[in-house]
């Protein structure tokens, strides 16, 4: 604004002259008046935290407004905490230069230290100042402090959470059990280890999920501090599948304020209960020898065959296999058995054997019965239980051996000439065995052992049955190329033969051979006297009289 000044010159004390009016002057006047900041705690009074848990984070921000008019002539507000009457009251934060008309509801926080249980009562002081920075420039003016009454605000008790402890020794071991066997569940012993001083909540617990072959169930609520529940929650083992069925059961815990803090339910960390147990399947017999065929000749030592079995299993979780013999078909005998054959193993070579009786010729058939048992010995210790039966098909043939009889007496080719063609001589043989239910046939060949004078050929083909004779297939031949007196033998290689066994060589006596091969007479002619000429030699000569006159006297020659 402006101010007009009336001016006069006054000589009093100087010139002594009378006052002289001077011309007036106008003065321009400028300036600003700033009001101080005005602090208002919007949520002053009681901060009611109620009942809280030990370890909870308990805090609340003050809402502070600079209520001075926002017209450009109000200073800004600073705020900060002073002291607190209870050491468990916590303060943090401050406010700087809060503009007129503005509110800060986050920077300054009041809280409670919940490290220990008990009641908390107290008061916190908030200091304020009006700050001219950026407005009046007049610096900082201290304003009256204000108190936030905490007596009612933080008067609730501080409660600790329930503290679960699983007392049952772990792992809970169910040992080895047979597949499908009902397993008695084991109850867990659970303690609420929180102190029983009136400031601890109660404990809720429930089974909630498993791994592996573990089962779990049950729950309880409101277990008092220092209380133990050893019946409500149980763990077990699912025995429907063989193998290592161990795993874990998850137990979910809650701290329940019902009847204590009134704070409702607070989730606590879950805990796992380790469970072990192995489930064994029953023995699984696999018959490796579904059939047996044996052959022998009457009077032989009885041939035997092994019956093999495997306890078939994909892993070690299989009980042992016992095998005992049942009825054995007529014509056969059996022996042996199998005891506690381990998973995946095959019986030893001679564990179970069947033998063919060789007292009577004939064909025999039937079965060998087997009984299978799963034994818990060494695994589950469960009682033996039948796992079925098996049957091995038996077939046996007992042959009466052939009996070789050589019917031909010594063969004499007589006296022949060198170069003669001499007919072969046959050697007759008979299978002299008595016909029975099953007979070998007689087979064989003939030879002369490399003789240069005699040779032999032929065989008995498919063989001679009991009582049959062959007098055409085996023969001997004389070599007449060289004169001489010859003796030799025809050897018979005869065997008892059937389709199931190796041939049985039969002893025979060689057939004696004899022959005389003579040269023809060999005349030699010489001309002694007479006509003509004589030529030639051996068996062919020519007497040549040359040319003669017809009707002339006959020529004569003496030889």
Language model features by range: what are they?
Residues 1-559:
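Feature for long, exposed domains in two main contexts
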């Amino acid at each position: 604004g402006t101010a007009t000044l009336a001016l006069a010159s006054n000589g009093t004390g100087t010139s002594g002259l009378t006052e002289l009016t001077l011309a007036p002057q106008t003065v321009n006047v400028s300036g600003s008046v700033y009001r101080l900041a005005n602090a208002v705690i919007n949520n002053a009074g009681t901060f009611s935290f109620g009942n809280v848990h030990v370890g909870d984070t308990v805090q609340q921000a003050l809402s502070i407004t600079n209520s001075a008019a926002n017209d450009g002539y109000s200073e800004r507000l600073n705020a900060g905490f002073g002291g607190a009457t209870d050491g468990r009251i916590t303060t943090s934060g401050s406010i700087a230069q809060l503009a007129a008309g503005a509110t800060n509801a986050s920077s300054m926080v009041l809280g409670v230290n919940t490290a220990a249980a008990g009641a908390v009562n107290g008061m916190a002081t908030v200091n304020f100042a009006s700050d001219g920075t950026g407005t009046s420039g007049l610096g900082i003016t201290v304003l009256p402090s204000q108190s936030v009454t905490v007596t009612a605000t933080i008067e609730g008790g501080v409660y600790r959470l329930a503290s679960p402890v699983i007392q049952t020794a772990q792992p809970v071991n169910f040992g080895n059990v047979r597949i499908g066997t009902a397993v008695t569940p084991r109850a867990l012993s659970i303690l609420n280890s929180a102190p029983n001083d009136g400031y601890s909540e109660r404990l809720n617990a429930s089974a909630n999920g498993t791994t592996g072959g573990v089962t779990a169930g049950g729950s309880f609520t409101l277990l008092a501090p220092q209380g133990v529940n050893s019946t409500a929650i149980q763990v077990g083992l699912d025995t429907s599948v063989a193998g290592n069925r161990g795993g874990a059961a998850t137990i979910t815990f809650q701290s329940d304020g019902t009847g204590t803090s009134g704070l409702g339910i607070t989730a606590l960390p879950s805990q796992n209960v380790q469970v072990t147990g192995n489930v064994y399947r029953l023995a699984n017999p696999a018959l490796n020898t579904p059939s047996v065929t044996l052959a022998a000749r009457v009077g032989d030592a009885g041939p035997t065959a092994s019956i093999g079995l495997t306890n078939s299993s994909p892993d070690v979780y299989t009980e042992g296999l016992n095998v005992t013999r049942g009825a054995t078909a007529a014509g056969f005998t059996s022996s042996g058995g199998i005891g506690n054959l381990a998973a995946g193993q095959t019986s030893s070579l001679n564990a179970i054997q069947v033998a063919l009786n060789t007292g009577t010729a004939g064909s025999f058939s039937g079965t060998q019965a087997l009984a299978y048992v799963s034994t818990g010995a060494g695994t589950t210790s469960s009682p033996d239980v039948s796992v079925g039966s098996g049957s091995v098909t038996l077939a046996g043939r007992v042959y009466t051996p052939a009996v070789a009889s050589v019917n031909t007496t010594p063969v004499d080719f007589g006296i022949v000439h060198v170069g003669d063609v001499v007919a072969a001589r046959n050697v007759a043989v008979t299978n002299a065995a008595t016909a029975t239910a099953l007979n070998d046939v007689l087979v064989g060949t003939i030879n002369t052992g490399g003789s240069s004078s005699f040779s032999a050929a032929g065989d008995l083909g498919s063989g001679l049955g009991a009582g049959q004779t062959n007098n055409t297939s085996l023969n001997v031949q004389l070599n007449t190329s060289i004169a001489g007196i010859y003796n030799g033998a025809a050897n018979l290689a005869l065997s008892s033969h059937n389709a199931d066994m190796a041939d049985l060589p039969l002893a025979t006596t060689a057939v004696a051979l004899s022959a005389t091969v003579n040269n023809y007479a060999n005349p030699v002619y010489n001309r002694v006297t007479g006509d003509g000429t004589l030529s030639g030699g051996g068996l062919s000569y020519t007497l040549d009289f040359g040319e003669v006159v017809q009707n002339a006297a006959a020529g004569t020659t003496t030889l």
